[in-house]
Structures are given as structure tokens and as C-alpha cells.
């Protein structure tokens, strides 16, 4: 049986918006997990993912209210905003999936350079490592970091660089963020189509002579 009736479209749209709320919560949790374990060091990336999660939840609330009350104006703005969110989320997700190791290293280097010494020391203790990368263009930084490093590994004199440890987890985090974002960006197109279809349907409980 094809879901084409008013009630079926309404229930489908409500269910989809509940899924959006869960996805928004998932994005916030994954971003917080990445920050807590030092996987993603840039506060701009963390803030961006959390902002997308909160924004997606707000859009889902608007969609739920519009679906429950068959509110024409709210459904229209819901469609427009959801399509814009789709474009943004699709672009970000593709960027996460397409980021290679060299780009990840550059991102970590730029984030490391703007960190204060206290932030670096705190991260080194949490990951039990010293310095970022032992490369020729970062020799000055690595020597300074090794001098200031107070991680437990310094007592064993077997410290690895923090960059290597973060790269091990950053690929995993980027794949999770990119995969989840890409999958649900396509469900947002489904949401736009459902909202458009539902908006143009007549409410059977309304006055039969009333215009949509």
C-alpha cells in the first residue's frame, strides 16, 4: 500500500523529524567525544559540528509543529531551511570523507600552532605523548615541546609524538562524521519532498469548502 494519504504523510513527516532530532543529538555527542579524547583539537571544528547538531534539532522542532498543525507558513520555511541545511551538510560531509592524511596533518599543525603552552601540556598528558610531529619544518617546535613536556612517558623515555596518536583517531572520527552526515543529508531531501507533498494535501478534518 502506497503512503499517499494525509494521515500517512503526516505520520511519516513527524517520524522523520524525530530522526532528525536524534541525528542532531548524535552529532553533538560524537563531537564532544572527539573533543574529550583529543581526537579533534580545533575548537572551530568542534563548535561547527555542535552548531549543526543544535540547528538540526531546532529545524526538527519547527517541522514537528508544522506537521502536527498542518501550518502552511511553518512548513514552507521548514522546506527552504532544510534544503539549505542539506547543501551545507552535504558539502561538509564530503570534505570530511575526502580529507587525506596530508590535509589532516596540515590541519593539526595549524591547530597546534595557535595552542598555548598550557593547552599543549594538558593534551600531552592526556594522550601520554610529546610534541606534534618530528619533522624538519617543525624542529624548533618539537624541541621546545620536548623541553616543556611532562607526560608520564618522559620517565620511560619512550614518547611518541601526539600527531601520530591523533592521526590514528582523526581518520576514524572524520569517517564517522562524514558518513553519518552524508547519509542523513539525503534524508533531508526526503524531508523536503514529504513536507512539500503534505503541505499541498487537504486536511480531511478542515472545512471542505476552505482553500488550502
Swiss-Prot record:
One term under GO cellular component: membrane
Extracellular side of membrane: 34-44, 94-175
Pfam families documented for this protein: Tetraspanin (PF00335)
InterPro entries, A to Z: Tetraspanin/Peripherin, Tetraspanin_animals
UniProt topological domain (Cytoplasmic) ranges: 1-12, 66-72, 197-212
Membrane-crossing residue ranges in chain numbering: 13-33, 45-65, 73-93, 176-196
Subcellular location, record wording: Membrane
Chief site of localization: membrane
Record key words, sorted: Glycoprotein, Membrane, Transmembrane, Transmembrane helix
Sites carrying sugar chains: 117, 134
Membrane topology: Multi-pass membrane protein
Family: Belongs to the tetraspanin (TM4SF) family.
Full protein name: Tetraspanin-31
Originating species: Danio rerio (Zebrafish)
Chain's gene name: tspan31
Amino acid at each position: 500500500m502506497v503512503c499517499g494519504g494525509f494521515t500517512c504523510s503526516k505520520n511519516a513527516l513527524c517520524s522523520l523529524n524525530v530522526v532528525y532530532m536524534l541525528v542532531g543529538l548524535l552529532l553533538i555527542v560524537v563531537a564532544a567525544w572527539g573533543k574529550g579524547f583529543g581526537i579533534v583539537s580545533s575548537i572551530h571544528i568542534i563548535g561547527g559540528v555542535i552548531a549543526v547538531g543544535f540547528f538540526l534539532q531546532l529545524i526538527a522542532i519547527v517541522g514537528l509543529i508544522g506537521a502536527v498543525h498542518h501550518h502552511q507558513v511553518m512548513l514552507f520555511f521548514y522546506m527552504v531551511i532544510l534544503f539549505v541545511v542539506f547543501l551545507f551538510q552535504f558539502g561538509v560531509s564530503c570534505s570530511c570523507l575526502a580529507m587525506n592524511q596530508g590535509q589532516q596533518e596540515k590541519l593539526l599543525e595549524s591547530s597546534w600552532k595557535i595552542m598555548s603552552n598550557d593547552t599543549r601540556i594538558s593534551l600531552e598528558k592526556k594522550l601520554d605523548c610529546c610534541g606534534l610531529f618530528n619533522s624538519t619544518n617543525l624542529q624548533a617546535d618539537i624541541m621546545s615541546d620536548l623541553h616543556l613536556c611532562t607526560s608520564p612517558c618522559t620517565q620511560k623515555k619512550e614518547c611518541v609524538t601526539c600527531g601520530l596518536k591523533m592521526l590514528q583517531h582523526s581518520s576514524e572520527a572524520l569517517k564517522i562524521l562524514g558518513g553519518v552526515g552524508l547519509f542523513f543529508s539525503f534524508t533531508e531531501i526526503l524531508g523536503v519532498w514529504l513536507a512539500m507533498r503534505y503541505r499541498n494535501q487537504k486536511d480531511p478534518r478542515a472545512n471542505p469548502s476552505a482553500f488550502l
